[in-house]
């Protein structure tokens, strides 16, 4: 049946040029969207949209469980995780499961349990997704008013925002409890080369925690990415958890103020654009975190950072040549600067050569050799431990550089290993996803603003190929 009145009133985003394509009751005519617009057809069907989201969560959790078990099945305890292309087990190891001193894996059973739990969860979510997509009510407003909503209902929207914030806050506290009471987490800075320990002396000083937000993002400052101890990381999660929970309660109990009602666009597509913008920012921050930070992402599991691999090479050859009789304190390099050691712009003693650009690296295998003014010459001559030599030689040959065809490491390094670091994968993937989510944010924000202003026309579908095909039903 042709609709005789304008759908504009109900579906402000697209005005239809034609509505002849029918698809299982969710056709163009009744929804204002063609089949390829995906979940847009479900904008006003809260029950079916719930099904789509639950099913999507099921797919995500299924991937996590299946990939987790795949990594367990292929895991070789004798090789470091980062040499085996693992991206999930390093996260579990960082949480303190299955590892001992030096990041050595002593038990893979917790990893197996994690995979199985995710698979079971995905089955429950998958069932819920199928149920709500095919069997459950199309809309929740009538039968389950608590779970129902209308996109324009500003008070309900901020209540939903509040519930999400409370859940995020509880998630932050899960990490706090794991680190402080349930077996601890892996600390790469533990003496002697890293170990699992419970974090009991949390940093709760607001000047320290919020001081990170005020730091410059550049150089040795590094904004929040510069955090280099677990006390600050776990203490930061206490603050995050409190802020999210209190903010969530605030949004549940209050209605949006007049300025917010005026300033924001209140539609499903607008909320989508806000979310995409936020996730984009998180993606870019995660990219920098995994690339530069070796405390939250320990090098024992993820491989060295770029600066770390470079400094490790300088250290390795300093050790070798010192054994061969070189005076590393005074040897001159080809440019007239120190060959092994030189001074930073602010006077600290640092490694010489090309790695001078990474002079503000901090790493657990190197810090014991520093004194009050940079690297300590007497410690370099007398205090270097075998574990520091072994680790730096290992990191030197596993720089987080590489291409998709797995020719990894520094192009000029003859001892490099044929691998690509998980750091490269995680940093690159989060950068690329952050970028695409940003583009999605711009796209949906533009459409939402246009719809609110009332001039979104849609696409002329007269020549759409699917219109000349046999209907599916």
Curated annotation (Swiss-Prot):
Mode of membrane association: Multi-pass membrane protein
Sites of N-acetylthreonine modification: 15
Main location: plastid
Propeptide: 1-14
Alphabetical GO biological process terms: photosynthetic electron transport in photosystem II
InterPro entries: PS_antenna-like, PS_II_antenna-like_sf, PSII_PsbC, PSII_PsbC_sf
Transmembrane segment boundaries: 69-93, 134-155, 178-200, 255-275, 291-312, 447-471
GO cellular component: chloroplast thylakoid membrane; photosystem II
Record: residues binding [CaMn4O5] cluster: 367
Subcellular location(s) of the protein: Plastid, Chloroplast thylakoid membrane
Keywords: Acetylation, Chlorophyll, Chloroplast, Chromophore, Manganese, Membrane, Metal-binding, Phosphoprotein, Photosynthesis, Photosystem II, Plastid, Thylakoid, Transmembrane, Transmembrane helix
Entry's family note: Belongs to the PsbB/PsbC family. PsbC subfamily.
Annotated cofactor note: Binds multiple chlorophylls and provides some of the ligands for the Ca-4Mn-5O cluster of the oxygen-evolving complex. It may also provide a ligand for a Cl- that is required for oxygen evolution. PSII binds additional chlorophylls, carotenoids and specific lipids.
Modified sites of kind Phosphothreonine: 15
GO molecular function: chlorophyll binding; electron transporter, transferring electrons within the cyclic electron transport pathway of photosynthesis activity; metal ion binding
Organism listed in the record: Anthoceros angustus (Hornwort)
UniProt-recorded name of the protein: Photosystem II CP43 reaction center protein
């Amino acid at each position: 049946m042709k609709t005789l009145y304008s759908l504009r009133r109900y579906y402000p985003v697209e005005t239809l040029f034609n509505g002849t394509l029918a698809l299982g009751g969710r056709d163009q005519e009744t929804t204002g969207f063609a089949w390829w617009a995906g979940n847009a057809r479900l904008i006003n069907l809260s029950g079916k949209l719930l099904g789509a989201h639950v099913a999507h969560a099921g797919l995500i959790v299924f991937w996590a469980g299946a990939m987790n078990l795949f990594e367990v099945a292929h895991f070789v305890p004798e090789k470091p995780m980062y040499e085996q292309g693992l991206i999930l087990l390093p996260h579990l190891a960082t949480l303190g499961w299955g590892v001992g001193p030096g990041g050595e894996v002593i038990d893979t059973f917790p990893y197996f349990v994690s995979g199985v739990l995710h698979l079971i969860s995905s089955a429950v979510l998958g069932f819920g997704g199928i149920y709500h997509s095919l069997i459950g009510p199309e809309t929740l407003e009538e039968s389950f008013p608590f779970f129902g909503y209308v996109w324009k209902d500003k008070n309900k929207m901020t209540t939903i925002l509040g519930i999400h914030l409370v859940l995020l806050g509880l998630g932050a506290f899960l990490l706090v409890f794991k680190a402080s009471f349930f077996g601890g987490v892996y600390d790469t800075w533990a003496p002697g080369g890293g170990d699992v320990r419970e974090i009991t002396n949390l940093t709760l000083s607001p000047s320290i925690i919020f001081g990170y937000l005020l730091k410059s993002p550049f150089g040795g400052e590094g904004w929040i990415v510069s955090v280099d101890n677990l006390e600050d990381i776990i203490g930061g999660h206490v603050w995050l958890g409190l802020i999210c929970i209190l903010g969530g309660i605030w949004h549940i109990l209050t209605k949006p103020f007049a300025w917010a009602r005026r300033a924001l666009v209140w539609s499903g597509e607008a909320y989508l654009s806000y979310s995409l913008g936020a996730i984009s920012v998180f993606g870019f921050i995660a990219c920098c975190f995994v690339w530069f930070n070796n405390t939250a992402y320990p090098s024992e599991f993820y491989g060295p950072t770029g600066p770390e691999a470079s400094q490790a090479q300088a250290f390795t050859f300093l050790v070798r040549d010192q054994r061969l009789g070189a005076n590393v304190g005074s040897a001159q390099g080809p440019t007239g600067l120190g060959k092994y050691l030189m001074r930073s712009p602010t006077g600290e003693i640092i490694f010489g050569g090309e790695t001078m650009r990474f002079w503000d690296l901090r790493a657990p295998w190197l810090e014991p050799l520093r004194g009050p003014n940079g690297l300590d010459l007497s410690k370099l001559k007398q205090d270097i431990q075998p574990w520091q030599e072994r680790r730096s030689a290992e990191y030197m040959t596993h720089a987080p550089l590489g291409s998709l065809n797995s020719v990894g490491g520094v192009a000029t390094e003859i001892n490099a290993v044929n691998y690509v670091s998980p750091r490269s994968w995680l940093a690159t993937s989060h950068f690329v996803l952050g970028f695409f989510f940003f583009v999605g944010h711009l796209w949906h924000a533009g459409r939402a603003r246009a719809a609110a202003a009332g001039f979104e026309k849609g696409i002329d579908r007269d020549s759409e190929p699917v219109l000349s095909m046999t209907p599916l039903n």
